[in-house]
Each structure stands twice: as structure tokens, then as C-alpha cells.
């Protein structure tokens, strides 16, 4: 999954220079208040990417195909007062535009030569310290080549009726 991660980090950072941080998600958000945890500081706006799983199937020859699942989180601080009449209600629109731009970049993007990313789920929530999290789950098809000399053979099942 590291091949997906490195590709996506570089792609998002290049296409969205307004982001301060694009990185692998290794718990930075959840450890904001844990001074005992050695981590780089989380600066916003940020995108954190976690390639969480691949469901593999066997293919003939020396490769496997799978469906990869990735969690992508856009993290934005929300210190603006956005109540009606505050004069800063536009901050809500700005956050939505950033979220939409990220999704537009990712939906259909082919990080490798396999299938494009497809969003399957979205969750939006407020986190401590006035942080908004826009989380989306994407899936895509991936193929991994095995080393030479490794191959899969199909198993034939034979039934006889008497």
C-alpha cells in the first residue's frame, strides 16, 4: 500500500498548494494533546491519508488483484465566528470549496495503472480545538506483481454423478 500512499501524497501536495501539510495518517490528529508522543506538529489545513486495507484475490500467473480502501481526511481549523451576521460566514463556504476541490482531485484519479479512486463514504465532524474533519473513504483496484518464479495455478474441481 505504500506505493499508493507515496503517489497520493505527492499528487495532492502538487495540486493543492494551499495545504500546509499532506502526509500519511499515523495518528497526528488523535495525539494533539499527548505531549509524551513524539510526532511532528499537525498544521492546518492538512490532508492525512491512511491506506487501511486491501482485499486480495488470486489471478493466473505472477500477479494478484485487490480492492484497496483508503481513508482521506481534510483537517481545517475553524476559529472564525460563523454565526449569522458575524461577517465571517464566508468561512463555511471556503471550507466547503476546499473539501470539494480535494474530492474533485481524487474521484476517478488513477494512482497506478489500475482502477480509479471511487468515494464510497463521507463523514464530517468537529474535533477538539475547533478543528473540522472532512473524512472520505475511497476504493480502487490495485495489482501487485509477484517475484519471478512465483505463480498461481487455478484449481479445477471435478464432480462425477452416479
Model-derived features with residue positions:
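Small/polar-rich, solvent-exposed N-terminal microdomains that initiate assembly or binding
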Residues: 1-62, 154-162
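Oligomerization/assembly interface segments of phage tail-like spikes and tubes
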Residues: 64-81, 132-145
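Generic secondary-structure microfeatures
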Residues: 51-55, 72-78, 106
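Extracellular/virion structural assembly segments
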Residues: 63-67, 77-104
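Short, cysteine-centered beta-strand-loop-beta hairpins and adjacent loop/turn segments enriched
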Residues: 56-59, 77-85, 143-151
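Charge-rich, low-complexity terminal tails
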Residues: 139-162
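Acidic-leaning, charged glycine-interspersed low-complexity segments
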Residues: 18-21, 42-47, 91-147
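Short structured motifs
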Residues: 33-35, 55-56, 86, 118-124
Amino acid at each position: 500500500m505504500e506505493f499508493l500512499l507515496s503517489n497520493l501524497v505527492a499528487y495532492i501536495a502538487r495540486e493543492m498548494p494551499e495545504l500546509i501539510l499532506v502526509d500519511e495518517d499515523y495518528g497526528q490528529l488523535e495525539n494533539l494533546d499527548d505531549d509524551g508522543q513524539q510526532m511532528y506538529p499537525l498544521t492546518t489545513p492538512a490532508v492525512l491519508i491512511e491506506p487501511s486495507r486491501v482485499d486480495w484475490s488470486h489471478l493466473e500467473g505472477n500477479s494478484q488483484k485487490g480492492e484497496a480502501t483508503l481513508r482521506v481526511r481534510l483537517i481545517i481549523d475553524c476559529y472564525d465566528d460563523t454565526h449569522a451576521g458575524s461577517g465571517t460566514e464566508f468561512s463555511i463556504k471556503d471550507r466547503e470549496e476546499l473539501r470539494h476541490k480535494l474530492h474533485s482531485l481524487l474521484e476517478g484519479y488513477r494512482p497506478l495503472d489500475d482502477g480509479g479512486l471511487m468515494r464510497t463514504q463521507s463523514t464530517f465532524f468537529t474535533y477538539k480545538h475547533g478543528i473540522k474533519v472532512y473524512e472520505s473513504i475511497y476504493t480502487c483496484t490495485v495489482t501487485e506483481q509477484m517475484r519471478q518464479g512465483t505463480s498461481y495455478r487455478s484449481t479445477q474441481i471435478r464432480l462425477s454423478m452416479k
